[in-house]
Amino acid sequence: MSKKYPIISVVGSSGAGTSTVKNTFEQIFRREGVKSVSIEGDAFHRFNRADMKAELERRYAAGDATFSHFSYEANELKELERVFREYGETGRGRTRTYVHDDAEAARTGVAPGNFTQWAPFEDNSDLLFYEGLHGCVVNDEVNLVRHADLKLGVAPVINLEWIQKIHRDRAQRGYTTEAVTDVILRRMYAYVHCIVPQFSETDINFQRVPVVDTSNPFIARWIPTPDESLIVIRFKNPRGIDCPYLTSMIAGSWMSRANSIVVPGNKQDLAMQLILTPLIERMVREARRARA
């Protein structure tokens, strides 16, 4: 953690909805005049697309059917921790971009499935924003939690997460349902051992819960809408969080536990704005004072 150069880490698996959360943060940053630098988690994958395919084939031939992008060893977590540490100490660091498709290739000049060159962060930033799979990993080799000042988890109930991933990968990446299902199965071991434990380290978790039948996500024709969902928001330490105020400001919300509130799915953005804006404002104010 760093008073001068704070770090916000948002963790969620593929299809969890972290991009929506990132958009809300960008709105807050813009409104509050916060200059941020950002890291996308896939920038720290260890392999490009071709090399990952070869590594998957090698491991499968050796009897390992669990290796995936969720796995620790498929990612440069020591390098990610080094960047977190450097930013917290100096406000400097570096990142790159993983190019997913032709549109990104046209913008970056790099073929899909490859990385851009490493590039330094812009100077004079207020904070670092990370969004990806591994921003709160604690294991025998790295401890990313100790570097992050605000840690958020985005964890829909599992069937909803699968529905969102299937629909996203079919629409944006041209995969078949069967291909996405194979990916889900291969990732399950690392999901349980590498992704899920991070949600015990986060300060706030946002869990979307559908109120329609999602019992077979592999045949679902559409993603449950916000109006067909609830959001459970859990605070690791509710001290300083005025839950009665939040429930009074958000129509249809209530406290389900002393550290949890439930809001209608179409109020997620409002809830995040109300919860996160004062936290970010205080974090940035104290950081600017410490740097002065």
Swiss-Prot record:
Superkingdom to which the source organism belongs: Bacteria
Pfam families in the record: PRK (PF00485)
Stretches of the chain forming a coiled coil according to its record: none
Keyword Kinase: yes
Assigned EC number: 2.7.1.19
Record keyword Hydrolase present: no
Pathway(s): Carbohydrate biosynthesis; Calvin cycle
GO biological process: reductive pentose-phosphate cycle
InterPro entries: P-loop_NTPase, PRK, PRK/URK
Amino-acid positions noted as binding ATP in the UniProt annotation, renumbered to this chain: 12-20
Reaction catalyzed: D-ribulose 5-phosphate + ATP = D-ribulose 1,5-bisphosphate + ADP + H(+)
A molecular function GO annotation: ATP binding
Keywords noted in UniProt: ATP-binding, Calvin cycle, Kinase, Nucleotide-binding, Photosynthesis, Transferase
UniProt cross-references to NCBIfam families, sorted A to Z: PRK15453.1
Sequence similarity: Belongs to the phosphoribulokinase family.
Protein name from the UniProt record: Phosphoribulokinase 2
Species for this entry: Cereibacter sphaeroides
